[in-house]
């Protein structure tokens, strides 16, 4: 482990105490919890609890709050994972792809990965016809795209954004 990573871990560990961890875990479970209920669960009075939450937000530890939507009820039941391989030889191909993908609301996640391909994308669509349209009119036309491989998810076994904090 590099010295920089060790320093970051020490800094993070010093910045968060056991009560901060409890607050973060409760907010991960229920982002709509009231400050009064949160303070009871973590063993603080409401004012210091709220001050800690505000500090965690200001520090960027808490990045925001979101509603989890049911894609089945919102005409986006088909989850598709796409591998993207870029052409080699253009010096700015990764930067151009990164900039272009940011503008696509249809793409829920985009990860630059190591291995046999370059990017892993996650998208949700109504059906295969909609995905074929997205692939043909959008994904294949992104800067530097050389090859794609598509995986249609048959069953979502587990989906969570919960971070295990200790």
From Swiss-Prot:
Bilayer-crossing residues are none
Q: Does the keyword DNA-binding apply?
A: yes
Fetch the Pfam families from UniProt: AsnC_trans_reg (PF01037), HTH_24 (PF13412)
PROSITE patterns, sorted: HTH_ASNC_1 (PS00519), HTH_ASNC_2 (PS50956)
Name the cystine pairs.
none
Keyword annotations? Activator, DNA-binding, Transcription, Transcription regulation
**Which stretches hold the DNA-binding feature?**
35-54
How does this polypeptide assemble, per the annotation? Homodimer.
Q: What does this protein do?
A: Mediates a global response to leucine. Exogenous leucine affects the expression of a number of different operons; lrp mediates this effect for at least some of these operons.
| Name assigned to this protein | Leucine-responsive regulatory protein
Q: Which gene encodes it?
A: lrp
